Regions:
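A generic short-segment signal for beta-strand/edge and adjacent turn/coil regions
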Residues: 1-3, 16, 33
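Structural detector for internal amphipathic alpha-helices that build alpha-solenoid repeat scaffolds
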Residues: 8-27, 35, 43-58, 65-68, ...
Length: 90
């Protein structure tokens, strides 16, 4: 199942399961997740952000690229990158 299809089914009861499914897609999900992070709100945005953090290092370069293109997105990208890089140390 694709990222968009999973996110369409998202609710409070299945968010953990769907997040796990998104993360299992790995780096192939990152471009769509970054686009969704910039356009979504609420529960979807939270699941997208956590998915990017859990995917980890494969998210970093595309987060940086998106931040360079969209100045309003910079703080979000910086936060997620810090979370990803901080989890490598732990």
């Amino acid at each position: 199942m694709q990222v968009n299809e999973l996110l369409e089914k998202l609710d409070n009861n299945n968010k953990n399961q769907l997040e796990n499914e998104i993360v299992s897609l790995g780096s192939s999900a990152v471009p769509v997740l970054i686009e969704k992070l910039q356009t979504s709100k609420g529960l979807v945005r939270g699941v997208v952000a956590m998915s990017l953090i859990r995917i980890g290092e494969d998210s970093v370069s595309l987060l940086k690229e998106a931040a360079n293109k969209n100045q309003e997105f910079t703080w979000v990208a910086d936060y997620l990158i810090n979370e990803i890089e901080g989890s490598k140390v732990a």
